[in-house]
Each structure stands twice: as structure tokens, then as C-alpha cells.
Amino acid sequence: MAETKANPFDMDSSSFDAEKYLERLLKDCSLKQIMDTEAAVVKDTQTLHSDMQTLVYENYNKFISATDTIRRMKDDFKQMETDVNLLMTKMQSITTFSEQITGTLQGTRSQLCRLSEKHSLLKRLQFLSTLPAKLKSLIEEQNYAQAVQDYLHAQKVFAQYGRQPSFDGIQRDCDAIMADLKEQLRSDFQRAGNTAQSLTEIGELLLQLDEKTSDLASEMLTCAGKRLHEQIVMLQDQTERDMLEFVDMGIDGFLNDLALVVTSYFDMFVAKHYEHERDDFQENALQELNVFLNQNIEKYLTLVQDRVESDIGYGDTQVMLRALDRLHRRLQAMRNICRGLEVQRNTVSIIISAAHQLCDAHAKNLKDHFADSLSAVRLSLVSAKSDAAAGLNLGDLISNLYVSMVEKIKGVLQDLLIFLRTDWSFNIKAEHKGALCVEGIRENLLIGFLRHIAKVMCGFGDASSSSPPNLLLVLSKTCLELEQQGVHILIALVDDLYEIDSENSATLTHETEICAEMRETAQSLLDAYVRLQGTNISQMLRKSVETRDWLNCLEPRSVRAVMKRVVEELGSIETVVASLYEANTNATSGFRTTASSDSSRKTYFSNFASTSKPQYRSNWSNYTPSQLESSYVSNIHRLFSERVEIFTSVEFTKASIIMGIIKIGLKTLLECVRLRTFSKFGLQQIQVDAHYLQMNLWRFVSDENLVNFLLDEILGSAVQRCLESVLMEPNAVEIICERG
């Protein structure tokens, strides 16, 4: 590459030409620029001059320091040269002296080597000569490991000098001593009560003494099994300890010994190769060790499971799970102690089983609590002074029963949530059986208990049950509350706590199924209540009809007492029902506060008709006997054409409930009247009673036409069964009823 052309105008260049630079500067620049250039050049010159002075001063100091250093080095080298010369003189003297020693000892070196070898041999011979006595001493001190080590060390010497007659006796003595030791070790190996550590140590010594490997392997597992069985028996007696202490004892004793036996057996018989054994010895030994390990773990875990089962429902669940978590961690560690070993059973199955059993225990506790709550409700109803007083308290009874059940279930669900804590080393939801167990908490515990509630409550409504009416009303209302609120709250809670996707599961019970069962139970109990109260009213009416001589009656002067009693009883029932069910105030149903215009007139009964048919009333007092007789066929036709359903399901309203009771009572009265024969005064008494009922029953019902129809039927049947069909004057009936 060509060199850069020299620039005469560059002041930093070696080819700088001052004359040319000034000539160019005067030619190209103005006066001001020339003066500025001059000032810049002067400034740079001063700066360079200052830097040069600084550099000179610094280098001068360094030069002075270097001069001093060189001077000192010269002085040091002079002293060092003197020392080196002295060292060389001494090294020459040492070399000369060494050559003299070598020459002097050359003749005795071989003799010293021979003496050293003889000394070593004499020491070995001395070891052999004292070996029998030493072995006996070590055995007496029970220092078996040192005795075996010394004997094996001597075997090498015997192998070298064993043909010498002088050593033959020593070898026989040593062999005899070690044979006795071998028998003693074998006896100790088979003795019960040995720890796993001692079994391992004795097994190692027997192997060194050429015990048959296969026999020793089998015997080691047998003896270890006996020792482990003793520990199992000992653990069975530890019933007074809590679960955590019990598991700790098992880990520190049984499992640690088992792990020691397994690792020792593996190192002695599986990891080593023995020339004199069969080729499949190691494989068979590993298989036997696997069987031994799993058999003993199965025994121990069975014992743990029995203990868990005995503690379920009595001990602290958290303590139990802490113990099982600790055991699970220990077994997880045991799975990795030796390559090729497989632990088949783990603690998760025990934990899942414990969860199932705890669910069963909680289910039993829930059922017992529910039974106690029902007993408390029945006792409260029995101790109530009157139905009216009971009615005021029914709301509290229902609230207490409902809240106690819901809160008890919530508490149980929270208690069982401890199985799913994230700090446990196990995760039962990861197992298929564990996932089924979690779903079982929902299905078997919650859903099962809700169905148990429905079943038990429904049983109170059976005809064979002698349940008090108010109890049926309380249970019906409680079921209705569960259907409207409780079921949804509890199922949503369990799905949220246990992360269950019940909406997309085909196997889990849906909320609507349980709600339907609860509503069906509530309906059944309410219908039973209506039947029971209707039956009570019916019995009063039936007895009043059957016990009276209707052919020899006096002219009626008042309403019969039983009719007043019926109205009073209906009033008490209405008070109780009103405390639980609000009246429906729409136009077609609800509690009546005023009578219809028809019933307020001085006429008595209108034939039952639907709203699309015109109402009409029957004035029996205006009919002649022939007219009454001719109306018989029309009444029969009306009976079959306008049938009234008596035992139908009622609605969850006060008006519907009271109407159902009234229908049963009036239907019973109708049937009783049809079976009796009446005189004129008997017919008139029925007329007075029916009018009294019409005057008082309208306020209980929402459909006055239905009541009037049934009362029409009653009076019509009495007319048809009367020997002299003459009714009282309407004014007279009105006066008697108002006075009564």
C-alpha cells in the first residue's frame, strides 16, 4: 500500500514547512482569522510546553529512583556471589563425604536387607504362633469381627507355609477355634430377639467364614421375619398411645429395621456375584427380597389400617392424617433404597379408606343428630299447652330444625376438607379411587343424608304412623325450606369446596332431583296433615250423627254443640296454618274477610256450579213433599255429573289446606247422613246445623261455592232420607243460628 503523501501544512507532521504555512495563511485568511490562528497557536504552544515540563519532571524522578535501585542491586549481587561461592565449596565437601560413606557401607547393604526380611518373617511367625491364643481371647471378649479379620489374614500365611509341619498344628488349632466360632455365630443368627443390626453383622461374618450363600440368604430372611413379627406384636399392644406416637414407634422400630435388613440383604446377596452359586442366584435373591419386603409392609399397613379404623370417629382427624402423612413420606423414601425393589402397597389406600370410614361415621352422626332434633321437635309439640300456642312456636321449631341440619352438614363438609390440604405429601384426588371417594363425599354423605331426611320425614306421613298433626306440618314446611334454599346451598358448597364439576357429570346426582324429592316429601306430609285433621273433624261429625236417635228428635231449638266444636277446631287449625303459610290475596283464592252477597241473604244454599254457570239456591222450605220427591232424580244426576274430588293434593297455601280439611269433614257428614233415617225434626236439625256451618265456614275458604255445594248435598240427602220432608221456615233457622 503506498505511503500517505507528506502534508507541509500539518503542524503535527514531520514535513511541516513554516514558510509555506505562513504564506498560505496570509494569502487565504483575513486579518481577524490570522489573529485567531496566532492566538490558538500560542495557546497550544504554552500547553505543550507545560506538558513537556511535567513529563520531564516525572521522568527525572523515575530516573533517580532507577539509579538508586541499580546501585542497590549491584551491592546485593556482590553479597550473593560470595554466598554462592561458599555454597559450592560446601557441596563439594558433601559430595566427597557421601562417596566415602557409600564406599564404606557397600559391603554391609545386602546384609541389612537380609536382616530386615528375617525380622519381618519372624514377626509373621510370632503372629502365627500367638494366633490361637489371640483368637480365643478375642472370642471371649466377643470381638468377633477382629477375630475373623485376624484369621483371614493368617490364611494367607498358612497358604504360603502351610506345608511346614510346625505350622500344621497351629492351622488346625485356628480352624477348630473358628469352627466353634462359626457354630456360635450360626446359633446367634438363629436366636430370637436379634436386632436387624446384629443380624446384618453376624451375616457378614458368616459370609467371610465361607458359609453357604444361598442357605444364609434364606436363613437371614427367616430370622429377620421373626424379629419383625415380634415388633408387630409389640405395636399391637400400644393401644394407649395416640396415632402419631403409634406411627412414630412403627417408623423408628419396624420400618427402620426392615429397611436395614433389606439394604443389608441387597448388598450381601444381590449386589455381589458369587462364583460358587448358580447363575440365577442374584435374580432369585432379589425376587425373594421383594416378596419379603411386601409381605412385611402389608402386615404393618394392615395393622395401621386397623388402628385407623378403631380411631375413626373418636380420635383427632388432623393428628391421624399427620401420622399417615409421616408414614407416607417414609414409605416413599423406602421405595428408593434399592434398585429393583417394588413396594406394591402405599398409604394412600389407607387414607382413602379412612376418608370413606370417616364419611360413614359422619353420616351416622348426622342421622343421630337429625333423630335427636326430631325428638326435640316432638317433645316441644307435646309440651305445648294448646294448638294455638304451638302454632306461634312452629316457626321457631322449623327454623331451629332447618338451621341445625344445614349448619351440621356444613361443619361436616369442612371437617372432611382436611383430607385435601395441599401441605400433605399425598393427594388422594390423583388416585382414581380417591377421586371416587371425593365424589362419594358428595353422593354418599350429602346426597345420601338429604335423601335420608326425605325418607324419614315421609315415614311420619304414613297412615300407620301416629304422628301429631303439627309435627306433620313442621316437617312439611322444613322440607319445603330445604327444597327452596337448603339443597342449593349445600350442593353448591360441596361442589365449590371439593372442586366437583357436577353440572357436566353423568354419574352425579343433579340438584333438581333432590329438590324434586324434597318437594314430593313436603307435599306428602302436607296431604297427610290435611287427611289427619280432616279425619279428626270427621270423627266428631260421624259420632254426632251415629249416636243420635234421629227418628225421635225434638223440635230443634239450637245448633248442636258438635257443630260449634267443629268451627272452633277449624279456627285453631287456621291459626296454626296461618303462622306458616301466608294467605293468597288474589281474586280467585285466599282468606275471606267478608261473605258473599248470596250467603248474607236469608236463603241457605246455592247449588254448586262453576263460574261460567249461574248460581242458584234451593229453598227446601218452599217445596211440597211431591216436589221434594221429584227432585230426587235431579239430585242423583247432579251427584254423578258434578263430582267433587275430596282427597286431592293441596297447595302450599293456607286457604288450600283449610279447604282440604273442610272437604273431608263435610264429605264424611254427607256419607253419614245418607246412612240414617230422619224424622221431620231430625231433618230440621240437620237444616239448622248446615246453615250454621254455612254461616261460619265461608271465612276459612276461598271457594264458597264448593262449601255451599257440599252443604246442599248434605241437606238434600237428609231430605231424601226423611220420612216427613218438612223444612223449617228460613227466618226461624236464621234466628236459631244467630242465637247459637
From Swiss-Prot:
Transmembrane segments: none annotated. Residues 65-87, 322-344 form a coiled coil. GO terms for cellular component: cytosol; EARP complex; GARP complex; membrane. Belongs to the VPS51 family. May act as a component of the GARP complex that is involved in retrograde transport from early and late endosomes to the trans-Golgi network (TGN). It comes from the Eukaryota. One of its GO terms (biological process) is retrograde transport, endosome to Golgi. It comes from Drosophila melanogaster. The lineage of its organism: Eukaryota, Metazoa, Ecdysozoa, Arthropoda, Hexapoda. Keywords: Coiled coil. Pfam families: VPS51_Exo84_N (PF08700). Component of the Golgi-associated retrograde protein (GARP) complex. This is Vacuolar protein sorting-associated protein 51 homolog. Signal peptide: none annotated.
